[in-house]
């Protein structure tokens, strides 16, 4: 008589493995779009925060120049797209009032913030004189990078 082999019940059957993988695939399939939209939203929020950092920094510069009697924002970039590129960021803002002060030197890390793709923002400044004789100073910041989640979002601020 042959000895009976005992069956071991440790491990998974093929059916249990297939069902587990199907459940895992379903969970991953539903989580990926949620994760993607969260990532995109986070990048858009970061871009808005960077534009606000630029605005605040330029307003601080404006206040300093106002106290010195010559209120102004850093000049508009003279490149075709008015982008705050490295050439503009390294150019002296006002050689008479503050020699050696460049847009990038206004920031603690020595760099003008960029969008989440590493591309510069659009920047423009202008002033307008009201009928009362009051001069209003404006800055416009805009994300012109078509690949950015905050594409075409802009902020106009005045003082």
Residue spans for each PLM region:
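Aliphatic-rich helix starts adjacent to a transmembrane/signal segment
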Residues: 21-25, 34-53
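Conserved alpha-helical elements of the SDR catalytic core
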Residues: 31, 38, 58
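Extended alpha-helical scaffolding regions
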Residues: 96, 105-112, 121, 133-135
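Short, glycine/small-hydrophobic-rich surface segments
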Residues: 58-106
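Short, surface-exposed interaction loops/tails
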Residues: 117-159
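N-terminal single-pass transmembrane signal-anchor helix
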Residues: 7-35
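N-terminal secretory signal peptides that target proteins for export/translocation
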Residues: 1-6
């Amino acid at each position: 008589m042959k000895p009976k082999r005992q069956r071991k019940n440790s491990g998974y059957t093929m059916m249990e493995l297939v069902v587990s993988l199907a459940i895992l695939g379903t969970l991953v399939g539903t989580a990926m779009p949620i994760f993607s939209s969260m990532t995109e939203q986070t990048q858009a929020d970061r871009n808005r925060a960077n534009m606000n950092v630029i605005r605040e920094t330029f307003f601080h510069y404006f206040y300093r120049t106002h106290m010195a009697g010559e209120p102004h924002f850093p000049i508009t970039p003279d490149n075709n797209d008015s982008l705050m590129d490295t050439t503009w960021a390294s150019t002296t803002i006002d050689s008479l009032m503050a020699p050696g002060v460049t847009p990038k030197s206004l920031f603690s890390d020595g760099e003008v913030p960029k969008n989440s793709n590493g591309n510069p923002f659009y920047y423009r400044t202008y002033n307008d004189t009201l009928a009362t004789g009051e001069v209003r100073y404006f800055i416009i910041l805009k994300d012109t990078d078509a690949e950015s989640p905050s594409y075409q979002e802009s902020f106009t601020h005045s003082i």
